[in-house]
């Protein structure tokens, strides 16, 4: 699971279990295809993870499965009940969804590794971790290079960050707004056109 959704879910549940006031987690995901069978597989995995967490009161997790239009994604990023964006991804080429999320003026929490660090500055919440060998079963047959590594966030640190953002939200909003302004300017259509013209 290149996005490390399993450990994101487990960390979230462990962090906020048995609390009277809890945030919820919205998972925008799909497996191989946006089919009913795939959705059921995603929900089954979610139930398996929930079953590993000991707690009487677990926070809600909402699953948005399949493809959304650009307008629907924009509505999700900017919905007033969505307070932050989080990813435990093991690695990205560029990480466009994280760039889009950064434009929402809400805190973005992501690993301090891979393509997205090109646009997630110190105004984002970058999680420490370590490079680890990619497990054989994570790749399709005959597609794995032995030396392949990916990044794994420090889950204990991530848990503390999630809790602090939930309890002290206002201290993160100024940086989130700064990140949005920088990225709107740096990655606008005009700015990207100019960069491409310089390359060509």
Feature-to-residue mapping (PLM):
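Short glycine/serine-rich donor-binding loops of glycosyltransferases
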Residues: 95-98, 113
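Short hydrophobic beta-strand element within catalytic cores of glycosyltransferases
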Residues: 107-110, 125-126
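A conserved mid-protein helix/loop that constitutes part of the nucleotide-sugar donor-binding site
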Residues: 1-14
């Amino acid at each position: 699971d290149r996005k490390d959704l399993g450990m994101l879910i487990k960390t979230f549940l462990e962090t906020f279990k048995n609390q009277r006031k809890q945030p919820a987690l919205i998972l925008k995901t799909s497996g191989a295809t946006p089919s009913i069978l795939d959705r059921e597989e995603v929900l089954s995995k979610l139930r398996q993870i929930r079953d590993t967490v000991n707690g009487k009161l677990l926070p809600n997790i909402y699953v948005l499965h399949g493809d959304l239009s650009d307008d629907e994604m924009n509505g999700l990023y900017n919905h007033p009940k969505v307070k932050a964006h989080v990813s435990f991804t093991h690695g990205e080429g560029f990480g466009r969804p994280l760039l889009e999320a950064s434009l929402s003026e809400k805190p973005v929490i992501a690993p301090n590794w891979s393509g997205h660090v090109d646009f997630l500055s110190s105004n984002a919440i970058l999680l420490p971790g370590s490079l680890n060998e990619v497990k054989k079963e994570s790749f399709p047959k005959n597609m794995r290079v032995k030396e392949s590594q990916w990044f794994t966030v420090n889950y204990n640190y991530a848990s503390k960050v999630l809790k602090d953002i939930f309890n002290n939200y206002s201290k993160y909003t100024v940086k989130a707004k700064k990140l949005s302004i920088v990225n709107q300017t740096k990655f606008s259509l005009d700015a990207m056109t100019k960069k491409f013209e310089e390359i060509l």
